Amino acid sequence: MGMRMMFTVFLLVVLATTVVSIPSDRASDGRNAVVHERAPELVVTATTNCCGYNPMTICPPCMCTYSCPPKRKPGRRND
């Protein structure tokens, strides 16, 4: 297959997936709004796990007190 043919197939796939996903967004008609309002309470954040609520996580205690030393940027002089 030539380069032009592969590019045409790629564009057709992108167009097809876009056309298929647009009607499915409209079909929900706001029914997902209840799920999105409830989601933050159900998702456990890394900070909550890290600060002692979940004993199975391994993370430095300085993350809970925000006293971790700043990371050095690679490729720069770190004087």
Curated annotation (Swiss-Prot):
Localization per record: Secreted
Tissue: Expressed by the venom duct.
Keyword line: Amidation, Disulfide bond, Gamma-carboxyglutamic acid, Glycoprotein, Hydroxylation, Ion channel impairing toxin, Neurotoxin, Secreted, Signal, Toxin
Residue ranges the record assigns to the propeptide: 22-38, 75-79
Residue numbers carrying 4-hydroxyproline: P40, P55, P60, P61, P69, P70, P74
The record's account of how the chain is modified after translation: O-linked glycan consists of Hex4-HexNAc2 hexasaccharide. Contains 3 disulfide bonds.
Residues annotated as signal peptide: 1-21
GO cellular component terms given for this protein: extracellular region
Glycan attachment sites: T45, T47
Functional note: Probable neurotoxin with ion channel inhibitor activity.
Family: Belongs to the conotoxin A superfamily.
Name of protein: Conotoxin MIVA
Species assigned in the record: Conus magus (Magical cone)
